[in-house]
Amino acid sequence: AATQVGYHALTYATFPSQILGGPTWTQARISDEPVLSAGDYVDVLVAFNKEAYDTHSEEVKPQGVIIYNSDDFQLEGDDRSFGLPIEELARSTGNTRAANMVVIGALAHLVDMPQGYLDEFVEKRFRRGRDGDDEIIQSNIQAMVLGRTHTSESGFTLGRLAEPQMPEYQQIMVKGNEALSLGARAAGLEFYIGYPISPATTILIWMEHNLIGDGKFAYQVSSEIESITGLLGAGFAGKKAMTATAGPGFSLMSEGLGL
């Protein structure tokens, strides 16, 4: 929503490579000027659980704000914080998946971002020609408005962002894995083989949709060992080949690396 109206943005997300899952977090920076790094501190922390607060509260600037999920835990003694019943508000819209939209509405209030920016984005994002599009769009907008309203009642604010200026050139919002995949494709990649593991899974998905035709293809295997041995085999056969994995997956590949 921010980039569509001319703001610059940078996001960074962490998804642990664990079978049982683990703590995940996403960091976003938005500015009217180019954003060159993620930075060391944040203006706002949204903690969905106590672990998130305990882990990241020290990263919040002294004049920053902490929003905590009061449906999950209570926080006392930190005058930078206020509770937001994120899950309860999402349920009240009839869309239990709208918790993140509640948070977006809360953040929009803190920086005084016009609701129209958000509404326009939701309309574009969820208008897909399906029978339930109207209901989905309205529930998400309602969730944002509820988050904004509850946050306004808290009295917290960070001041309004400077008005965005649409650049003369076209801005592109691209994910890191997508940019990497585009680069590999442009470099002549012919064969991609991989096993789904975070955060490499999105590379595999992109390749399955885009590495097609002219003898090029992507292949999902059932283990990391198959992935590395298949990669080596393709290389020996003269193909420009590629795989991607994470720490645990790379450890499993060590057997194949010995070839």
Predicted regions and their residues:
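Active-site cofactor/cluster-binding pocket
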Residues: 1-187, 191
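Thiamine diphosphate
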Residues: 1-57, 198-259
